[in-house]
Amino acid sequence: MTSTTLVKCACEPCLCNVDPSKAIDRNGLYYCSEACADGHTGGSKGCGHTGCNCHG
């Protein structure tokens, strides 16, 4: 059995942990969603994951 190492999403207020092999990689930082990776531009709130209401 292989274990997966999860890392915290690079969006500071985000609560999500992501698998680096499935995350969005921007400049070596791993994000759980495009909203987080884009810095919540345009006032987007939340990353779409249950229980997380990050706003960048």
Curated annotation (Swiss-Prot):
Factors inducing expression: Upon exposure to a range of metals, particularly cadmium, zinc, copper and mercury.
Residues that, per the record, bind Zn(2+) 1: C9, C14, C32, C36
Keyword Metal-binding: yes
Entry keyword set: Cadmium, Copper, Mercury, Metal-binding, Metal-thiolate cluster, Zinc
Binding site for Zn(2+) 3: C14, C47, C52, C54
Family statement: Belongs to the metallothionein superfamily. Type 14 family.
Top-level taxon in the UniProt lineage: Bacteria
Function: May play a role in essential metal ion homeostasis (especially zinc homeostasis) and resistance to certain non-essential metal ions. Binds four zinc ions.
Protein name from the UniProt record: Metallothionein
UniProt: Zn(2+) 4 binding residues: C16, C32, C47, H49
A molecular function GO annotation: metal ion binding
Residues that coordinate or bind Zn(2+) 2: C11, C36, H40, C54
